Swiss-Prot record:
Biased composition (Low complexity): 33-45
Name of the featured protein: Small ribosomal subunit protein uS9m
Region: Disordered, residue numbers: 32-81
Species of origin: Candida albicans (strain SC5314 / ATCC MYA-2876)
Subcellular localization, as worded in the UniProt entry: Mitochondrion
Amino acid sequence: MALRLITRFRGLNIPQRSLHQSTFRLNETIQSTTTTTTTTTTTTTSDEIPTTKPRFQSRFRRNQQPHQQQRSPYTSSQVTENLNIGEINRVRTVPTLMTYYGGNPVHEDNMNRLRAVLKKYQQLPVRVVPDREIQSQKFIGFDDYLEKTQSGTRVKKIHYRELITLLNRLRTIDLELMPLEVSEILSEYTSKSVSKIVQLSREKTLDCFGRAKTQAKRKSSIAKIYLVKGEGEVLVNGKSLIEFFPNIYARKNLLYPFQVVEQEGKYNVFAQVTGGGYTGQSEAIMYAIAKALVVFNPLLKPRLSKAGLMKSDTRIVERKKPGKVKARKSPTWVKR
């Protein structure tokens, strides 16, 4: 059998493959594969891949073909380049509330708004809210607040009490200096079903001539005045102060508000007064002057209030009773 094979392949030249040649070929293939893998990781295009043996090159192309099919034809940079900033903002979803990811977003947003406004106007002077105003202007109830927030069972009564506490603190700001922003917030949370008995006095301003117009009462006297900055001239019913009030105590009463604020001789007063005697007329003008000074400078109100000039004296003369000589005086007792 061996002789037949030798005679059959005698005319052929079969090269012998030595061991050192096979190891050299193996090392060469290992180096070529390592270079191809490093180039594929560091580059992005297939044109920069180094040349290798045909069989390894075909295998490399066969392995890379599925990855190229999965890759998107448009990169992220190409997509953003085709859109402007306005379109990107429309595509991006942004929550409407800053507290969207909280447990109670609507209520927390309301509380943050009230705290910011309270911190902004914390330096303004405060007042004592009268009971009549509290009864006439009530805030919305718990059920109305639930309907307003649309948060269901997330809003508890303790949350509602925290809200009312902040609203009451905002309501204590002086009416003469209350900002429009605070007034809008208070009206937003005020109950519409409660009838407004008290009409809140708005801040008075100067007229086109720079005058402050006010009026006041004392006993049966009614005084209307115009106050303007000047040299300290006072006219009462068209007459000078000394001519109309010969009594020195009446003149002191009239000028007392200027002494409280240390503004003597800096304003002109034009007054019209009717009814009563010189005491009632002079004090009626005094209260009217105090109100006019607040129009010029609202910060003077605490000093004038402390002096008792912002609230008129409501005492009047007691009437005469039957069987009495005067209001309480009885006639002289005579035995016979």
